[in-house]
Swiss-Prot record:
Gene that this sequence comes from: ompC
GO process annotations (BP): monoatomic ion transmembrane transport
Family indicated by similarity: Belongs to the Gram-negative porin family.
Main subcellular location of this protein, as a coarse class: membrane
Keyword Transcription regulation: no
Signal peptide stretch: 1-21
Function text: Forms pores that allow passive diffusion of small molecules across the outer membrane. In K.pneumoniae it has been shown to bind the C1Q component and activate the classical pathway of the complement system.
Oligomeric form and interacting partners: Homotrimer.
Protein name: Outer membrane porin C
Highest taxon, organism lineage: Bacteria
Assigned GO CC terms: cell outer membrane; pore complex
Molecular function in Gene Ontology: porin activity
Keywords: Cell outer membrane, Ion transport, Membrane, Porin, Signal, Transmembrane, Transmembrane beta strand, Transport
Membrane topology: Multi-pass membrane protein
Length: 363
């Protein structure tokens, strides 16, 4: 019975991102759930910038309220707290998600706040590794991952007419510099800035666990970004396509992304053009073991003074063992295939392997 339960639970955990959110309140159409995890995590690497303790905790709240038969309000907040430094250290906690919205029956939903960019609707399919992965893009990287000030419209099953056909439309306001003409109230460094932008995604669950998706995003770039060593242009564009198979204990996913002035090249700026590729494969055994293998590559084209260079390139081999729905342990080995050269050194890109070992309690 235990192995049967595990075989049903684990895929659900991977999709939901939480093992079994604790229901705090559910009465009169109002519901509030608490979820989170504590990851006792250690990295082993020759790269002294990452080697050592990486323990952290995440905590989130999801709520919804039934306004009438067709209208539901909802909100979500998620927070990350690092636990690998002294109690007096700074910059050890931050908000990952914070948004509120309304769902209008089959007409779709609209929300605003800090949320995932629509490009992640497709690239998330390969972001399933035990520890690493999902790093041909990053947070606060236009609409490629978590981002500030995004207004998102989502529609599931195409107004209730086509099962499995989902689409989204998104707008992001400017997040500029700390001071000067391009300043905004939440100013940040050039690599994290963005001008006004929009994006869209379409995903379709075709049949028998097979899904396909496409996403596009276009954002204005800031003056600060165009003053960086790499990357020049008025706009940052992202085109993404992906395929996924998730059935019969097998998980296979791949995505290809082509960007223009949108993929970070370490600390130097943005690649004028980049080709990003990720593929991941996993198998869920009934007794709780989930081995994983993946390949990720981001290649920058025509990098000023450096030509074509790999920005990221590695093979990932790992495994997770689920004791039950709340407790798991994992090992993840990142086999770095980058060469140590003038570009990686100038950009501050590590070329060392990393092994991650973690013990996780989640709820």
């Amino acid at each position: 019975m235990k192995v049967k339960v595990l075989s049903l639970l684990v895929p659900a955990l991977l999709v939901a991102g939480a093992a079994n959110a604790a229901e705090i309140y559910n009465k009169d159409g109002n519901k509030l759930d608490l979820y989170g995890k504590i990851d006792g995590l250690h990295y082993f690497s020759d790269d002294k910038d990452v080697d050592g303790d990486q323990t952290y905790m995440r905590l989130g709240v999801k709520g919804e309220t039934q306004i009438n038969d067709q209208l539901t309000g909802y909100g979500q907040w998620e927070y990350n707290v690092q636990a690998n430094n002294t109690e007096s250290s700074s910059d050890q906690a931050w908000t990952r998600l914070a948004f509120a919205g309304l769902k209008f029956g089959d007409a779709g939903s609209f929300d605003y706040g800090r949320n995932y960019g629509v490009v992640y609707d497709v690239t998330s399919w390969t972001d399933v590794l035990p520890e690493f992965g999902g790093d041909t893009y990053g947070s606060d990287n236009f609409l490629q991952s978590r981002a500030n000030g995004v207004a998102t419209y989502r529609n599931s099953d195409f107004f209730g007419l086509v099962d499995g056909l989902n689409f989204a439309l998104q707008y992001q306001g400017k997040n500029g510099s700390v001071s000067g003409e391009g300043a905004t109230n939440n100013g940040r460094g050039a690599l994290k800035q963005n001008g006004d932008g929009f994006g869209t995604s379409v995903t379709y669950d075709i049949f028998d666990g097979i899904s396909a998706g496409f996403a596009y995003a276009n954002s204005k770039r800031t003056d600060d970004q165009n003053q960086l060593l790499l990357g020049e242009g008025d706009h940052a564009e992202t085109y993404t396509g992906g395929l996924k198979y998730d059935a019969n204990n097998i998980y296979l996913a791949t995505q290809y992304t082509q960007t223009y002035n949108a993929t970070r090249a370490g600390s130097l700026g943005f690649a004028n053009k980049a080709q990003n590729f990720e593929v991941a494969a996993q198998y869920q055994f009934d007794f709780g073991l989930r081995p994983s293998v993946a390949y990720l590559q981001s290649k920058g084209k025509d990098l000023n003074g450096y030509g074509d260079q790999d920005i990221l390139k590695y093979v990932d081999v790992g495994a997770t063992y689920y004791f039950n729905k709340n407790m798991s342990t994992y090992v993840d080995y990142k086999i770095n295939l980058l060469d140590d050269n003038s570009f990686t050194r100038s950009a501050g890109i590590s070329t060392d392997d990393v092994v991650a070992l973690g013990l996780v309690y989640q709820f």
